[in-house]
């Protein structure tokens, strides 16, 4: 692969140096005029759009400028379509509820490179309702991201148990970021990478502990599983311990990772 400098500003020595450093010391190719490259690309794209038969063997690929995903427990950005994915594209992933007997899930769609949604850009929100009563984590909610050739994003959420679904469509001119804002978000992700990594690890550890506590709670209450194998005294002791842990988690959202591991 070659690194090609495109655009007049790439003649600036400092920019060339930064590009070289970004690619771990690999020298950019200097055999292409950066101004001519822009003009050539624009001409080819114009030919493709106008249906010129001579451009039949040429393909210009559009890519997703920022990672797309949804918000999950703890404000985590769960990624579905990574940055620089060639479009059109489609990706699905299974999610579930965050509490027992939850009748509605809210799907918040974000773009950005940070691990928490508070640092990314909200594109849209919609609700999936009518979820039958069930323990936390049991319902199967399939979320699908689809980007067409025009860059239009369609997000669908479907309850696999009932077939109930809802969706949102986000166009290119609807609450989207400018190229300058996109560049800033990418730079921020690199700048705060180490800090974000530690924060994400703490939240993941908390979520794992919470999931384990609720799973154990459900098993204790199920006579066909752990609940049927315990004596009344042991069952009462375990139920009390689990409830205390859940209450502690709810009142210590910002505890240190060491506390969650204790």
Swiss-Prot record:
It is found in: Endoplasmic reticulum lumen; Melanosome; Cytoplasm; Cell surface. The keyword ATP-binding applies. Residues 64-144 are annotated as: Substrate-binding (SBD). The modification Phosphothreonine is found at residue 162. The keyword Membrane does not apply. It comes from the Eukaryota. GO terms for molecular function: ATP binding; ATP hydrolysis activity; ATP-dependent protein folding chaperone. The modification N6,N6-dimethyllysine is found at residue 229. It catalyses: ATP + H2O = ADP + phosphate + H(+). In unstressed cells, AMPylation at Thr-162 by FICD inactivates the chaperome activity: AMPylated form is locked in a relatively inert state and only weakly stimulated by J domain-containing proteins. In response to endoplasmic reticulum stress, de-AMPylation by the same protein, FICD, restores the chaperone activity. The chaperone activity is regulated by ATP-induced allosteric coupling of the nucleotide-binding (NBD) and substrate-binding (SBD) domains. In the ADP-bound and nucleotide-free (apo) states, the two domains have little interaction. In contrast, in the ATP-bound state the two domains are tightly coupled, which results in drastically accelerated kinetics in both binding and release of polypeptide substrates. J domain-containing co-chaperones (DNAJB9/ERdj4 or DNAJC10/ERdj5) stimulate the ATPase activity and are required for efficient substrate recognition by HSPA5/BiP. GO terms for biological process: maintenance of protein localization in endoplasmic reticulum; negative regulation of IRE1-mediated unfolded protein response; negative regulation of protein-containing complex assembly; positive regulation of cell migration; post-translational protein targeting to membrane, translocation. GO terms for cellular component: cell surface; cytoplasm; cytosol; endoplasmic reticulum lumen; intracellular membrane-bounded organelle; melanosome; mitochondrion. Its EC number is 3.6.4.10. Residues 53-63 are annotated as: Interdomain linker. The modification N6,N6,N6-trimethyllysine is found at residue 229. Keywords: ATP-binding, Chaperone, Cytoplasm, Endoplasmic reticulum, Hydrolase, Methylation, Nucleotide-binding, Phosphoprotein. The modification N6-methyllysine is found at residues 229, 235. The modification O-AMP-threonine is found at residue 162. ATP binds at residues 8-11. The interdomain linker regulates the chaperone activity by mediating the formation of homooligomers. Homooligomers are formed by engagement of the interdomain linker of one HSPA5/BiP molecule as a typical substrate of an adjacent HSPA5/BiP molecule. HSPA5/BiP oligomerization inactivates participating HSPA5/BiP protomers. HSPA5/BiP oligomers probably act as reservoirs to store HSPA5/BiP molecules when they are not needed by the cell. When the levels of unfolded proteins rise, cells can rapidly break up these oligomers to make active monomers. Endoplasmic reticulum chaperone that plays a key role in protein folding and quality control in the endoplasmic reticulum lumen. Involved in the correct folding of proteins and degradation of misfolded proteins via its interaction with DNAJC10/ERdj5, probably to facilitate the release of DNAJC10/ERdj5 from its substrate. Acts as a key repressor of the EIF2AK3/PERK and ERN1/IRE1-mediated unfolded protein response (UPR). Monomer and homooligomer; homooligomerization via the interdomain linker inactivates the chaperone activity and acts as a storage of HSPA5/BiP molecules. Interacts with DNAJC1 (via J domain). Component of an EIF2 complex at least composed of CELF1/CUGBP1, CALR, CALR3, EIF2S1, EIF2S2, HSP90B1 and HSPA5. Part of a large chaperone multiprotein complex comprising DNAJB11, HSP90B1, HSPA5, HYOU, PDIA2, PDIA4, PDIA6, PPIB, SDF2L1, UGGT1 and very small amounts of ERP29, but not, or at very low levels, CALR nor CANX. Interacts with TMEM132A and TRIM21. This is Endoplasmic reticulum chaperone BiP. It comes from Sus scrofa (Pig). The lineage of its organism: Eukaryota, Metazoa, Chordata, Craniata, Vertebrata.
